[in-house]
């Protein structure tokens, strides 16, 4: 495999004869990998490079050459990727935060859940990284929070928004080594009109960061969380709907 594409007069008739000053173009597209070839900490700042060359046997009379040749090169920087995974648990002793309340959830009775935000950064260094989500109606912030970095999530009671201001994340963080993780506890109290329904807990979780390699903003997200979609394997599907 030479990774070479060739155009000539046989497949591109316009190349058969080019008058002086003439111009033209050929186009092609390629598929790139769906993942980054990251195997060690230094694997970052990937680029796609194309070298182009055109030659002709026509040589000006004043040149002593076999052919005329023109060359050009194009190099494209590959954007990075920052991802967030939002998880929810009822039984979560490993986090160091103990939850209480009825399972299945019960009308007008509070049940605690722990929310985990797991962040990975792939092929570029990023700065100003931040994770955001909103608590849903009937959900309260308990104030129990922790993370494996200095910054922890904070809560705006007026807007019901939770924000985790991470800051700078080096490339391959969470891919080669342990990801960034924050944990906070919420208290959900279902209302009467949620009887025999699944209670929404957390809105879509969004992560943003500035890619220092391509000088552009990166965005990622994970789906909203309800009592139906919690990730706790100890809570069966039959015990996730709100009961009277």
Residue ranges of model-derived segments:
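A surface/secretory-pathway sequence property marking extracellular, secreted
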Residues: 1-17, 86-93, 128-172, 223, ...
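Low-complexity, intrinsically disordered segments enriched in Ser/Thr together with acidic residues
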Residues: 8-46, 51-60, 116-120, 165-214
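Surface-exposed coil/turn segments at beta-strand junctions on protein surfaces, enriched
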Residues: 19-23, 41-45, 69, 77-79, ...
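Gram-negative and organellar
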Residues: 21, 110-113, 137-140, 217-218
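Intrinsic-disorder/low-complexity, polar/charged segments enriched in Ser/Thr/Lys/Arg/Asp/Glu/Gln
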Residues: 23-27, 71-73, 110-114, 128-130, ...
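Extracellular/luminal low-complexity Ser/Thr/Pro-rich, glycosylation-prone repeat/linker regions
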Residues: 38-100, 140-151, 195, 199-244
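Short beta-strand elements of extracellular/lumenal beta-sandwich folds
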Residues: 96-133
């Amino acid at each position: 495999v030479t990774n070479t594409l060739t155009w000539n007069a046989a497949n591109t008739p316009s190349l058969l004869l080019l008058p002086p000053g003439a111009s033209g173009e050929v186009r092609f597209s390629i598929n790139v990998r769906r993942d980054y070839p990251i195997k060690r900490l230094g694997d970052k700042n990937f680029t796609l490079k194309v070298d182009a060359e055109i030659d002709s046997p026509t040589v000006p009379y004043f040149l002593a050459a076999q052919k005329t040749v023109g060359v050009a090169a194009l190099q494209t920087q590959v954007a990075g990727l920052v991802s967030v995974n939002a998880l929810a648990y009822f039984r979560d002793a490993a986090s160091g935060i103990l939850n209480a309340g009825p399972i299945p959830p019960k009308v007008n009775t509070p049940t605690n859940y722990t929310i985990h935000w797991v962040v990975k950064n792939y092929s570029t260094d990023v700065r100003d990284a931040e994770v955001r989500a909103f608590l849903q109606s009937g959900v309260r912030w308990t104030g129990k929070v922790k993370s494996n970095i200095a910054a922890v999530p904070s809560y705006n009671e007026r807007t019901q928004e939770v924000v985790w201001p991470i800051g700078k994340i080096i490339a391959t963080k969470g891919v080669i080594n342990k990801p960034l993780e924050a944990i906070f506890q919420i208290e959900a109290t279902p209302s009467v009109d949620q009887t025999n329904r699944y209670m929404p807990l957390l809105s879509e979780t969004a992560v943003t960061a500035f890619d220092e390699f391509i000088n552009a903003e990166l965005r990622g997200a994970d789906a909203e969380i309800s009592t139906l979609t919690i990730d706790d394997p100890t809570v069966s599907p039959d015990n996730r709907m709100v009961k009277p």
